[in-house]
Amino acid sequence: MANTTSAKKATRKIARRTAVNKSRRTQMRGAVRNVEEAIKTGDRAAAVKALANAEPALMRAAQRNIIHKNNASRKVSRLTAQIAKLAK
């Protein structure tokens, strides 16, 4: 339990930040899930459109330190490669 006033304030700030980050992470995961579902159905046009929404969501999450930059880049790269396979 926090004893000092500053520690109590820090605890409140952490709780607020955690809630915001959780929301952003959920939104990011949903965007990625939409791409994966479009890939599973084999709909290339829908997958490309979903990726256009997912890529900025991933990069924003990386920029705000919700996920690591390399993690975001890796996810975008892998999703792009899967979409490229659909074209063949």
From Swiss-Prot:
Pfam families: Ribosomal_S20p. GO terms for biological process: translation. GO terms for cellular component: cytosol; small ribosomal subunit. SUPFAM superfamilies: Ribosomal protein S20. Gene3D superfamilies: Ribosomal protein S20 (1.20.58.110). Disulfide bonds: none annotated. One of its GO terms (molecular function) is structural constituent of ribosome. InterPro entries: Ribosomal_bS20, Ribosomal_bS20_sf. Keywords: Ribonucleoprotein, Ribosomal protein, RNA-binding, rRNA-binding. Belongs to the bacterial ribosomal protein bS20 family. HAMAP family: Ribosomal_bS20. Binds directly to 16S ribosomal RNA. This is Small ribosomal subunit protein bS20. It comes from Bradyrhizobium diazoefficiens (strain JCM 10833 / BCRC 13528 / IAM 13628 / NBRC 14792 / USDA 110). The lineage of its organism: Bacteria, Pseudomonadati, Pseudomonadota, Alphaproteobacteria, Hyphomicrobiales.
